[in-house]
């Protein structure tokens, strides 16, 4: 098994994946663009070290990133060399586990995604299972029990050297401010092996849910169970919580785990509402608030960037966000987001013109008559009032922003939903 993992063809495939994913370097400072040259010159030595059990992974670099819902998420960034080896292990092991994983598990798996999880949840609701148990595992990636995980791996992996290498990666120290702290638990996010290991751990939960006959969807550590009554939901919630904490040795966040009605539930940034007797998918309010905050940051009046640069940034954000939420019924949401952003862009443009003379010249160029251009260019009204004025709304209208490169949320959403309709 280890020989196949360290085979040149497998390592070449892993190398391409690591280089493609880019990312910052680890504690040794080596970058992804240096990795191919390193492997060319050190392949035989590296292979021998690992085969003889003499290889020792470097500590991971601790990084804290803000979570979308508040707080921080801890990442452990391995060196690019360790990233290469972890990727080689993961891509060799993944097909072996795929045939055993649950059909209701959608995260970090080939040909599976968040949309499929949400659409499956919609089917459960439509079938009458309208009580939702939203499970929240407290600091899951940081608290995975190593012994239980290794016990699970033992069932699939017979090669003791491969098992030892994986354990070394689990136990690799974490460097923070120059100090290395040893790890006794967890499989921190940031490494190529972590997603597969997390699914192996939670596959036990999947099997237990299936054994009990529950309807559920799981995406990584985000799991929702669908039942028909509140009484059943409370019973299931208590039973599964006990199983997770006693059998899997994981902690359920009691404050965030809840039983809710679909309209009050959230799944991967989506929620649901009932329309004409059918459960429809919508964008969760928190997701809308987060994108508003992100766009607000980009369109700050005085952040040192031109309106053109802001539009370029917005375009990337809009395309990614709409592509993710395209399965939701969200026409009015997209229109309202555009309305708010165009107002902020008008403020940016008015600020960019700065002086009355420049404002007057630009208003005239955009078709505003001379008297109105003179009146508004000398106005002492605040930016917000100017941005909402009929004059500026007329001068800097939707067509103007389209010419500047801002197509907007609604236009991209319309194009994507139209494309989906034509495909199906």
Model-derived features: positions:
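Conserved polymerase palm-domain catalytic core
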Residues: 42, 49-64, 68, 100-264
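Short amphipathic alpha-helical coiled-coil/interface segments
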Residues: 39, 43, 337-345
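A glycine-rich phosphate-binding loop feature that marks nucleotide/adenosyl-phosphate handling sites
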Residues: 256-265, 313-317, 334-342, 357-365
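Short, solvent-exposed helix-loop connector elements
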Residues: 182-185, 296-310, 321-333, 350-355
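A conserved non-catalytic segment of reverse transcriptases
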Residues: 171, 247-319
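Non-catalytic, polymerase-adjacent accessory regions of viral genome-replication enzymes
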Residues: 1-38
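Extended C-terminal regions of large enzymes
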Residues: 353-424
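Core structural elements
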Residues: 11, 59-60, 68, 308-325
């Amino acid at each position: 098994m280890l020989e196949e993992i360290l085979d040149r063809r497998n390592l070449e495939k892993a190398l391409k994946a690591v280089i493609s994913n880019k990312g910052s370097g680890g504690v040794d400072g080596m970058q992804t663009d240096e990795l191919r040259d390193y492997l060319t010159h050190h392949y035989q030595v590296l292979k021998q070290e690992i085969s003889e059990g003499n290889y020792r992974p470097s500590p991971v670099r601790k990084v804290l990133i803000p979570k979308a819902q508040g707080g921080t998420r801890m990442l452990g960034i391995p060196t690019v060399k360790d990233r290469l080896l972890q990727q080689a292990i993961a891509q060799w092991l993944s097909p072996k586990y795929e045939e055993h994983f649950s059909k209701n598990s959608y995260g970090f798996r080939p040909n599976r995604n968040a949309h499929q999880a949400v659409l499956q949840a919609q089917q459960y609701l439509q079938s009458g299972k309208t009580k939702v148990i939203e499970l929240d595992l407290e600091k899951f990636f940081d608290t995975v029990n190593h012994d239980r995980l290794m016990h699970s791996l033992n069932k699939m992996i017979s090669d003791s050297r491969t098992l030892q290498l994986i354990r070394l990666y689990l136990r690799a120290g974490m460097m923070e401010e120059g100090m290395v702290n040893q790890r006794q638990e967890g499989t921190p996010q940031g490494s190529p092996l972590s997603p597969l290991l997390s699914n192996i751990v939670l596959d036990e939960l999947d099997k237990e849910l299936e054994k009990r006959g529950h309807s559920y969807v799981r995406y990584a550590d985000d799991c929702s169970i669908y039942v028909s009554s509140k009484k059943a939901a409370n019973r299931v919630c208590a039973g599964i919580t006990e199983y997770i904490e006693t059998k899997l040795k994981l902690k359920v966040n009691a404050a965030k785990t809840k039983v809710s009605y679909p309209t009050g539930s959230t799944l991967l940034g989506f929620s649901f509402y009932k329309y004409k007797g059918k459960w429809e998918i919508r964008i969760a309010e928190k997701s809308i608030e987060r994108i508003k905050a992100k766009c607000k940051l980009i369109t700050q009046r005085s952040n040192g960037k031109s309106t053109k640069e802001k539009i370029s940034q917005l375009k990337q954000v809009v395309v990614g966000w709409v592509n993710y939420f395209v399965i939701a019924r969200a026409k009015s949401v997209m229109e309202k987001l555009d309305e708010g952003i165009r107002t902020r862009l008008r403020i940016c443009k008015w600020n960019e013109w700065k002086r009355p003379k420049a404002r007057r010249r630009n208003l005239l160029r955009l078709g505003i008559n001379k008297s109105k251009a003179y009146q508004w260019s000398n106005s002492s009204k605040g930016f917000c009032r100017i941005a909402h004025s009929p004059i500026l709304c007329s001068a800097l209208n939707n067509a103007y922003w389209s010419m500047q490169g801002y197509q907007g949320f609604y236009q991209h959403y319309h194009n994507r939903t139209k494309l989906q309709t034509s495909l199906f």
